[in-house]
Amino acid sequence: MKPENKLPVLDLISAEMKTVVNTLQPDLPSWPATGTIAEQRQYYTLERRFWNAGAPEMATRAYMVPTKYGQVETRLFCPQPDSPATLFYLHGGGFILGNLDTHDRIMRLLASYSQCTVIGIDYPLSPEARFPQAIEEIVAACCYFHQQAEDYQINMSRIGFAGDSAGAMLALASALWLRDKQIDCGKIAGVLLWYGLYGLRDSVTRRLLGGVWDGLTQQDLQMYEEAYLSNDADRESPYYCLFNNDLTREVPPCFIAGAEFDPLLDDSRLLYQTLAAHQQPCEFKLYPGTLHAFLHYSRMMKTADEALRDGAQFFTAQL
């Protein structure tokens, strides 16, 4: 697709989305487009500080959890002593960026709105860790907390997975991994998926959308994939291309959120249509006027706050 054939996205987004796009952080250095991944990670963490400010206060605990690869950091957000369930949150960032700090506000709001314990898992990033290591560490953390639930005073009888972007893929992939391998980590009550990628390699939205404003050009998407996967065969794995998994049975209830001007939107639409066609419990909601990653911007965007409330409400309705 020639760039000039793409939609004029920045002219079409909502007023509050435009406010976010035009928000300047004077103390922030320029994006290191040609820098190392380490420099890009550092910039991403700095840039997200502004958007994470003002989040709800609540009891927070940090634990290192053992896996076969080593220790993985986790952070527990506890809005009340007697939580009805536990939600595991997987951050976005194209598999190569992000951490528990970059998504702190999202996790706090999700905990506040659901009144469930939220556990953020700082899964290993790529390219240092290749598929399926992140999923294996996520599953290991879930199993650890299930086994140690009494010691950590958390309710693991009912759990859920949630994530944005690449984290949404990891959330659903982890739920399917537990199902397929018959691993008991508590009943999976629901999966919350904000603007994820689930296995499409081409689509209408991937052609019409994506640019420097969201870091999701076709070249960007290819770069993230090459960093994450170990080899070409992994592209067809049912835990990367989730459409190659069995979506006709025992899929936990899924809340699927799409951003109107996100090149990954067709992934969400296809996931919803596939699940619905096979009578798997699911809900799809499109958020008009939004770009990919809008969930970060709840300081300025009512739509971002609404999307988090919607996900929390969906999850608690399954309990």
UniProtKB/Swiss-Prot annotation:
The UniProt entry, under PROSITE patterns, shows: LIPASE_GDXG_HIS (PS01173), LIPASE_GDXG_SER (PS01174)
Look at the named UniProt entry and state the broad enzyme category this protein falls under: hydrolase
One GO cellular component term of this record is: cytoplasm
What's the domain of life for this entry?
A: Bacteria
UniProt cross-references to SUPFAM superfamilies, sorted A to Z:
alpha/beta-Hydrolases (SSF53474)
Leader sequence segment: none
Cite the GO molecular-function annotations of the record.
carboxylic ester hydrolase activity
InterPro entries from the entry?
AB_hydrolase_3, AB_hydrolase_fold, Acetyl_esterase, GDXG_lipolytic_enzyme, Lipase_GDXG_HIS_AS, Lipase_GDXG_put_SER_AS
Its subcellular locations are: Cytoplasm
Motif, Involved in the stabilization of the negatively charged intermediate by the formation of the oxyanion hole: chain positions: 91-93
One short Pfam name that applies is Abhydrolase_3
UniProt keyword list: Cytoplasm, Hydrolase, Serine esterase
Q: What is its main location?
A: cytoplasm
| Disulfide bond entries | none
Q: Which residues form the active site?
A: 165, 262, 292
Enzyme Commission number: 3.1.1.-
Q: Which family does it belong to?
A: Belongs to the 'GDXG' lipolytic enzyme family.
Record note on quaternary structure: Homodimer. Interacts with MalT and MelA.
> HAMAP family per the record?
Acetyl_esterase
What is the documented function of this protein? Displays esterase activity towards short chain fatty esters (acyl chain length of up to 8 carbons). Able to hydrolyze triacetylglycerol (triacetin) and tributyrylglycerol (tributyrin), but not trioleylglycerol (triolein) or cholesterol oleate. Negatively regulates MalT activity by antagonizing maltotriose binding. Inhibits MelA galactosidase activity.
Protein name per its UniProtKB record = Acetyl esterase
